[in-house]
């Protein structure tokens, strides 16, 4: 089996964690496990994994521990937001910590039924891992024409354990947004403590005709965590989806967003902000298929890299043969804050249709000394001047958050990751 030297040990451990659940697992979960074992783990020789270090994770002793937390512990980690909140701890749904959903506009059922779930747009090994080890699926539905008054907040709390063991938690959600429906869904990932843990996340979303989705992801886990996520968006005709990801925490954080525009006149916006500090690595990946004509997509991905951090961006737009009048743009802007900070960026276009308008671009730079000088000349000290420029760089993304309270909490998290902040 191709892969890292210790990959067989990691695969065996994950296999044991799967078998520890007994015979109650779905056939689909078993199929993903078999695919995981057949595929093996990649090495740096694999192009898509060249810049994502796995050694620190693979050499671990994995456990699956379901902890109990109090409402007070939940509240200490929670967002201040008027929402319908579902709480998951160490991969498991906790009704006692969650809000009731009756009358909310969201129909929620949690089970291991996976027969109706969409196939992966871009499958890879950690997607198979999460699909196999996630113990249940959160099925969420918003009926035709419904517009829930409050956003749905999916809060994920994962604990690390003392010693060399790494707690492993996997979360699997699916949302069906029916024709003409409109909803906001927020994914919030936090750590219960400062110890190492490994989070896997998978969220698939069907956006039906004339439906409108606002999706926000907040990855705020601790500096020792590993986080691998795979979100799939499938849009029908005249559908709209806006997805905003703020990737602000984790030793290694790799987030994949894969999208299919399967109906004409659909509109897509995908934005992300990554801020690796110290020795952290944040890898952001997008895969977009323009499968029908007359669709519009815009992507803006920004990174602010400090110390010895590394940011990776890999994005691809694929325009199918008959997807005429496609309008797609993808931009990746990177700001280096440390002399040893690194960025690796690879935006790509694959166009098989005529009469389209597509572009991609990437920039990598540092703070302009003239900007600092201008602010210093007006009595602003060096650190404050630097922070003003960074906030301005991030503002294009944070301003997309409609809720002012949520925006301020994201800005506070950004502030913690700036030079001088409590990282």
From Swiss-Prot:
SUPFAM superfamilies: Stabilizer of iron transporter SufD. One of its GO terms (cellular component) is iron-sulfur cluster assembly complex. Signal peptide: none annotated. InterPro entries: Fe-S_cluster_assembly_SufBD, SUF_FeS_clus_asmbl_SufBD_core, SUF_FeS_clus_asmbl_SufBD_sf, SUF_FeS_clus_asmbl_SufD. One of its GO terms (biological process) is iron-sulfur cluster assembly. PANTHER family: PROTEIN ABCI7, CHLOROPLASTIC. Part of the SufBCD complex that contains SufB, SufC and SufD. Can form homodimers. Belongs to the iron-sulfur cluster assembly SufBD family. The SufBCD complex acts synergistically with SufE to stimulate the cysteine desulfurase activity of SufS. The SufBCD complex contributes to the assembly or repair of oxygen-labile iron-sulfur clusters under oxidative stress. May facilitate iron uptake from extracellular iron chelators under iron limitation. Required for the stability of the FhuF protein. This is Iron-sulfur cluster assembly protein SufD. The lineage of its organism: Bacteria, Pseudomonadati, Pseudomonadota, Gammaproteobacteria, Enterobacterales.
